[in-house]
Amino acid sequence: YGARAANGVILITTKRGQASSKVKVSYSGSYTLQTPGIVPDYVDGYNWALMKNEVSTGTFSPEALQKLQDGSDPDHYANTNWLDAVLRNASMHQHHLSVSGGNENTRFMTSVAYSNQDGIMMKTGVERFSFRSNIDTRYKRFTFGLNLSGNKNNVTTPAVAPSGEGGIMRYVSWFTRPTVPVMYSNGHYGYVDGSSLSAELMKNPVESMSLGHRSNEYWRFNGKVFAGIDLWDGLKFQTSFAYAFDLNATKSYSPKSPARYDAEGNIRKAAGETNKEEDYWYRNATWTSENLLTYNKQFDKHNVNVLLGHSVIGSRFYKTTASIQGFPTENIYELDGGTINPGAKGNSEEYKLQSFFGRVNYGYDDRYLFEFNIRHDGSSRMPKANRYATFPSVSGGWVFSNEELMKDYKNFSLGKLRLSWGKLGNQEIGNYAYAATLGASGNYFFDQGGDKQAGMVQTSVPNEDIKWETTRSINVALDLGFFNNRIQTTFEWFDKKTSDILMQLAMPGIFLGSLNAPYQNVGAVRNRGWEWNVNYSDSKGDWVWNVGFNLSHVKNEILEMGGLEETISGQTINRIGNPIGAYFGYKAIGMYRTEADLQRTNSKGEVIKQNGVAPKLGDIMYADLNDDGNITADDRDIIGNPFPKYSYSFNLGASWKNFDLSTFWQGVGGIYRYSWETSTDIRGNLTERWLDRYSAGNVNASMPALGNTMNDSYSSFWLENSSYLRLKNLEFGYTFRQPGLAKMGVSSVRVYFAGSNLLTFTSLKNWDPEKTSGDARNDVHPNMRTYSFGLNIQF
C-alpha cells in the first residue's frame, strides 16, 4: 500500500534474536572467482585489414597482409584482442559473523560483514564493511527497541569511466583496431592512428585505464528507536523515530595525457599540458516519524484487524563539487596542490512527505476475507493546491475449499478466489518541479566597457497545476492446492492504468529558448497481463524435492501524451496505441543480391533509390512505405517491440540425507534487440559475423557489403531475436551434523559450491541477451559468471 517508491510500500522485518534461547553464533564466508560473461568475438587483425581494404583501397598492402598473417612484425601489424587486454578474471571474498540470543523479555542480534571484490576490469574494485544491531525488550505492557545499521563502501575505478558514453568499453567496441598492439616493443603504448578519428577517440584503452584514478567512499548510517504499549485487549500503540545519514566523497584525478609515440619512437601526439583534480561531496539526512494504532480481535468466527497510522518523512541533501588544474607534480592529489582554474559549485534541496493511512481486515470463518486500505498523502514536491491526494483500495477473498460442500474432496487442499481494486500515487519527480527555478550566469553586460557581470536567470517554466500521478490496479486471482498442498498453483490477471503521468513536453506555439519545459500531467499508460505459478514439493524416505514454474505476459500501451500522437527519439518512438520506446526505423525486406534486384520499382514503375542514390549490390533493401520511389527518413516506422512476449522462470531443488541441490533458471521469449555495428569506414572492431559478408563470390551472405552508410541505418535488419534461457543460480552443499561437532560447541557445518550465469541458451551471438537497453552491443560492463566456494558454521 502507499505512495512511496514504485507505487507501493514493502514492509521489512530484519533478523532478530529468539526469546528464551541461548546465545547463538554463526559465521558464513565464501571465496568467488569472477569471469567475464558473454562478450563479442571480434575478427583478428588480418581479417580486419581485409575489410578495411574493401572500404578504403590500399590501406594495407600485400606485404602488410602477409605480416598480419605470419605475425612477423607485431609492432606495426598486430593481432590484438582488446577485450582480453582490458578484462580479466577477478576474485572476491565475503565474511559474515552474527551473534543472537534472548530471554523471556529481551532479544538481541548483532552482525558484522566484510567483502572485498576485485573488478573484472583493470583498476576496479569494491571494498565493503557493514554492521547491524537490533535489540528489543518488554516490561509488563511496554516494549522498547533500538535498531542500528551502517556500512562503508570504497569503490575504485580509473579516471576514465569503465563503460557508458566515452568509457573504456565504448572505445573497445567502436574505435580500437586489432592491428594496433597494446604496447610496442620499445615500451610505449600502441598508438591509434587518428586520421579518421577525433583526438578524443584516439585513445589506447589500456593506457587510458592506467592513467589517473577515481575513488568513491560511501558511508551510510541508520538508527531507529521505537516504543509500544498494550492499551487493552487487542489494542496496541507504537511510536518510532528513525534517522538515516548518507555521505559520499569522490576524488578523481586525471593526469596530463602523455605523449603518444609510434613504433619507431617518434612523437605522434604531444603530451598534454593540463592535469586536474575534481572532488565531489554529497551528504543527505533523512528522518522518519511514525505512529501506529492497531487492534486485533477474534470474535467467535469473526476476525478483525484494524490499523491507523501517521508518518512524516523529511530529507535534506547537500552537494558540493570543487576542481582545480595545474599540479606541478603527478604525485599530489589534493586541491591545494593545484595552481590554475579553480572552480567550485554546490546546492542543497529538501523534501517532506506526510501520510495518514488506515487499514481494516475482516475475516469470517476462514472463508470470507475483506480488506480496505486508504491513504492521504501530502508531498512538498506538489504545489500547495494539489499537495495532498487520497488513495483507496479494496480487496476480497473467498476460500471456497473451506465450504462444507468441498469436504468430500479429500485431495483438494486449497481453493481461493481473490479480487482487488485500488489506487496508488506517485510523486517521484524533482523537489521543485512545479516552481520556477533560477540559475547563476556571469554573462550580463551592463556598461559600455563590456565588462561581464554575474546575475541570475530563470531556467525553467513553472506549473502550479501539476498533481500526483495515479495508478489504478485491478487484480483477479485463483489459488489452488492439491494433495495436501504438495501441488499449488496460482493464476492472476491484472490491469494497471497509470494516469496523469508527469512529463516534460514542449508547449505548442511557445518558444522556450533555453528554458526547461514545465512538468505537466499529460500521459497515460496501461500494463495489462497475466501470471501463472505452479509448485510441486514432496518427499520419500531421505529424498526431498521441489519444482516451481512461473510464466507471465504483459502488454504495455501508451494511451495519452498530452494531445501528441507521437514523439521520436533516435531509434525509438512513443506513439499512441503502441508500447513505450518502440523500435523505429526502416523495414528491411531483403538484400540487393542480383542485377535484377537493382531494378526494383514502386507502384508507378520508378526505380527505387536510397536517399536519391541508386543502391549497390550487397546493400540492405528497405520498404518504400510512402511509395515515392526514394528511401528517406519518411519511410521509417515502428519495426519492433522492446518488451518480451513472455517471461518465465523455474526452480529445481532436491536433498538427500545431508546433500542439497538448488537451481534457478530464468528466461524471456519473443524479445528483440538492436545488434547494429557501423561498417561504413570501419573505425574499430567488428564481430566475426562479418566474415560472411556480401561479395561477388558470396551473394547469399548473411551480412551486407561494407561501405554503404545506408546499411548503417537503424532498421529491422539489425533487430535480432534475443530470447534466452539462463541458469541464473546453482548451489550444491553438504551439511555436517555429526555428534562429535556438538562436543566442540558446533551445531552444524555446511560447505557448498555456488555459481551464477553458468549456462545461457540463446540464438543471439556476440552479445549478452540479458542486457536491458534497446541497443544490445556490449559497450557497457559485461555481466559476470561467478564460481563460489562457501562455508557456514553455527555454534
Spans of features found by a protein language model:
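Residues embedded in well-ordered regular secondary structure
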Residues: 8-9, 16-123, 158-162, 182-195, ...
